[in-house]
A protein has these predicted regions:
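Phosphate-binding and adjacent anionic-ligand microenvironments
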Residues: 34-189
Length: 190
């Protein structure tokens, strides 16, 4: 299925299960990393640990980027990544495509994967560990207040000596997972 302007694709497996974009990125990474010299794969701060773990396991180089279509598109090119994407489903192929997001092209790459592996969609994710996540929670705010709140959370995390990544809001890294608090770039939400 494609979104309204055709720049994203949603993948549904043969069992009727929706495949999130970061899982689709695992499928593509499994195809690209073993066969290309450039093994850099870009992902945004909302993607799961399963993706970064798989990129690393395959010998690839995970490259973290802030969330946002314009950021990930530019960073995929500027960081010289063969492939990049974000949790919202914008995907950028640079191995044999121009590097912009096209739902149609991403869908065709899925068809290509199915054809050359002769596997079912669900089988393309075999061996990926199950990580549990909460759905995105949006808290209404004002544009001014949302920035203040994220800054206060950053300050708290520093005071508590948490390991953080502050590329986009504050992502607290833990041994068995992470938590992210960021403000929306497109609306008055945290």
């Amino acid at each position: 299925a494609f979104d309204g302007d055709g720049d994203r694709v949603g993948i549904i497996d043969e069992k009727g299960t929706y495949i999130p974009a970061d899982k689709f990125m695992i499928m593509i990474s499994r195809d690209l990393i073993p066969t290309h010299e450039n093994k850099r794969i870009l992902y945004d701060v909302k993607c799961s640990k399963a993706l970064t773990d798989e990129i690393t396991r395959l010998g690839g180089v995970p490259v973290l980027c802030r969330t946002g279509n314009s950021y990930t598109k530019l960073a995929t090119r500027d960081e010289n990544c063969i492939f990049g994407g974000e949790f919202s489903g914008h995907l950028y192929f640079r191995d044999k495509f121009l590097g912009f997001d096209s739902g149609m092209y991403a869908g065709l790459r899925m068809v290509e994967l199915l054809s050359k592996t002769n596997k079912k969609t669900s089988e393309l994710l075999e061996g990926v560990p199950k990580y549990y996540s909460t759905p995105e929670i949006k808290i209404p705010s004002t544009d001014t207040k949302k920035k203040e709140v994220v800054e206060k959370i950053k300050e708290y995390c520093h005071n508590e000596h948490f390991h953080t990544i502050e590329l986009d809001g504050v992502r607290v890294e833990m041994e068995d997972g992470w938590a992210l608090v960021r403000f929306s770039n497109t609306g008055p939400n945290i």
